[in-house]
Swiss-Prot record:
It comes from the Eukaryota. One of its GO terms (molecular function) is protein homodimerization activity. The lineage of its organism: Eukaryota, Metazoa, Chordata, Craniata, Vertebrata. Was named after 'sesquipedalian', an unnecessarily long description of a simple thing. SUPFAM superfamilies: PH domain-like. Coiled coil: none annotated. Residues 140-152 have a biased composition (Pro residues). This is Sesquipedalian-1. PROSITE patterns: PH_DOMAIN. The modification Phosphoserine is found at residue 213. Residues 17-113 form the PH domain.
Length: 249
């Protein structure tokens, strides 16, 4: 199999979320010791680096046509990735704890396309069984989970069925809009007297507009100085009368 090294290096170190990552002990050869490596699982590719800060992977394992199983080895929490074939290599790995080993075994077992085909096949069988239920009408969906067949892997959780949609709420009637806008007079709307526009009591008519008054006397056309003098004389006369009334006992 020919692979593009630059594309694999970019895919191994990109910012996309990973399926699993952590330190594992990898056995180098038939009689070699274990080396601590940083492993990253993306899809069906298992990359391993010198450490977590490395920018280029040391190698990659394509998880197709393989099985993941527990093995007895010098290291505790060991498991192996075995490929079919007489000359196929077996990768022996070891985790740092029991929980880490179980997590890696589960993630690696679900990484291949064979597992996805199995899941799709089981779901298709379920769908065919539901559709061809002897011509009987399907019951209404209830808010509970459907049982899965025993052959389906335990990794798939049952999907809860959705409840039936609620009944539609009747729409409220919209207010009736007038067919024409009321006329305007000098930019102001005039109250309409027709009952079609306002069914309630008739509003009071607007007050009449005041018009500019025309001059009626000689003072209306007099200049300001003359007006000031005339009104000043009246004020002085009134003030004199008021002072004289105070002086008299």
């Amino acid at each position: 199999m020919k692979l593009n090294e630059r594309s694999l290096a970019f895919y191994a170190t990109c910012d996309a979320p990973v399926d699993n990552a952590g330190f594992l002990y990898k056995k180098g050869g038939r009689h070699a010791a274990y080396h601590r490596r940083w492993f990253v699982l993306r899809g069906n590719m298992l990359f391993y680096f010198e450490d977590a800060a490395s920018r280029e992977p040391v190698g990659v394992i394509i998880l197709e046509g393989c099985t993941v199983e527990l093995v007895e080895a010098a290291e505790e929490f060991a498991f192996a990735v075995r490929f079919a074939g007489t000359r196929a290599r077996t990768y022996v790995l070891a985790a740092e704890s029991q929980d880490a080993m179980e997590g890696w075994v589960k993630a690696l077992s679900r990484a291949s396309f064979d597992y996805l085909r199995l899941v799709v096949r089981e779901l298709e069988q379920q769908l065919a069984a539901v559709r061809g239920g002897g011509g009987m009408a399907l019951p209404q969906p209830q808010p509970q989970s459907l049982p899965l067949p025993p052959s389906l892997p335990s990794a798939l959780a049952p999907v809860p069925s959705l409840p039936s949609a609620p009944a539609p709420v009747p729409a409220l009637p919209l207010p009736r809009r007038p067919s024409a806008l009321p006329p305007k007079e000098n930019g102001c709307a005039v109250w309409s007297t027709e009952a079609t526009f306002r069914p309630g009591p008739e509003p009071p008519p607007p007050p009449p507009r005041r018009r500019a008054s025309a001059p009626h006397g000689p003072l209306d056309m007099a200049p300001f100085a003359r007006l000031h003098e005339c009104y000043g004389q009246e004020i002085r006369a009134l003030r004199g009368q008021w002072l004289s009334s105070r002086v008299q006992p």
